[in-house]
Amino acid sequence: MVFGSKVIKSGGAEPDAFEGQIGQAILELEMNSDLKPQLRDLHITRAREIEFNNKKAIVIYVPVPKQKAFQKVQTRLVRELEKKFSGKHVVFIGERRILPKPQRGRRDPNKQKRPRSRTLTAVYDAILEDLVFPAEVVGKRIRVKLDGSQLIKVHLDKNQQTTIEHKVDTFTSVYKKLTGRDVTFEFPEPYL
């Protein structure tokens, strides 16, 4: 497989057909465009398709250490991949792992303390940041309803409204599917 170099799964597993298509598309972009130097060292770990409201979004997972490099070319990459996959929205998310909460009373003497970056809260916040890139999350409000359910209102940078406003429904659906949390996105006027 030629695209095997672009999809490197954890544990050395073989990429499935859909991941193969994504890998092939990224490889073609590397061959044909001026993105070659930036894309040469980059690879993805997995990809999946998420359906919502009769539309589809493609979620591409990238290794966290290579994420900064991906973000340098992400706007171009997303535009090209969306063209190739007939208008499906494409989002890049860092491949992160959540470690379970340590149990009370159980001590494992050779176990390290769980780092903050592996907690559920940190991972979910990072997914949110990755999802809305290139916009920035400038604020967050969590509304707890009387029945105990939570609605997260995320305030995004007003300067990026024109570039990502059409994708807000996609972001909401993808975040709900990945984390199970309801979220709404707003572009508030900046406070002075």
From Swiss-Prot:
The keyword Ribonucleoprotein applies. Transmembrane segments: none annotated. One of its GO terms (biological process) is rRNA processing. One of its GO terms (molecular function) is structural constituent of ribosome. It comes from the Eukaryota. GO terms for cellular component: 90S preribosome; cytosolic small ribosomal subunit; small-subunit processome. It holds the Pfam family Ribosomal_S7e. Keywords: Ribonucleoprotein, Ribosomal protein. InterPro entries: Ribosomal_eS7, Ribosomal_eS7_CS. Belongs to the eukaryotic ribosomal protein eS7 family. PANTHER family: 40S RIBOSOMAL PROTEIN S7 (PTHR11278), SMALL RIBOSOMAL SUBUNIT PROTEIN ES7 (PTHR11278:SF0). This is Small ribosomal subunit protein eS7. The lineage of its organism: Eukaryota, Metazoa, Ecdysozoa, Arthropoda, Hexapoda. The gene is RpS7.
